[in-house]
Amino acid sequence: IKAIIRHLERLGVTLINGSHAIDTVKDKLYTQQILAESNLPVPKTLLLKHPINLDWVEKHLNFPVIIKTLSGSFGAGVFMAENKKQLKQLVKMAEITNEGYDIILQEFVKDSYGKDLRVLVINGKVAGCMMRQSTDDDFRANITRGGEGIPYQITEDIEWLGGEAA
């Protein structure tokens, strides 16, 4: 797909999401870095390399924590650990399934449990907003996981954040 998108760009076809945007969002840590460098609010994020020092993690993040693989979409590779024991189990699973893995840990944002906002920005201007909401008490709100999309009123904060993030 990447080759097709780049080819369309070379032909001058207007795309909503170009190759640069897609490359950026495919790497969750890189996306966090770009947002943080722009002084936009992001959850505290740690990149973990094998072997992981769980005591060190516990000192730097409060539980629960969100565990993410660096790439992935549709909520795949995203887990929540309520405590150190669960984190240890998830880390062991990552070690078994992907030797030399990289994962990120993020502080859990309580207000976002089971919901998030998707903001459509076109040419630097917010064109629409949707709340994704879990329908089964999952902390993830992905529509592909059964969540639903609900139209959401665009506020000044959403207008500003959407424009800055784009």
Residue ranges, per PLM feature:
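Residues within well-ordered alpha helices
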Residues: 7, 34, 57, 164-166
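Aromatic/hydrophobic pocket-lining residues that form π-stacking "cages" and hydrophobic walls in ligand
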Residues: 4, 54, 162
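A short, GP-enriched loop/loop-strand-helix hinge that lies immediately N-terminal to
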Residues: 1-26, 41-44
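Phosphate-binding site of ATP-dependent enzymes
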Residues: 80-165
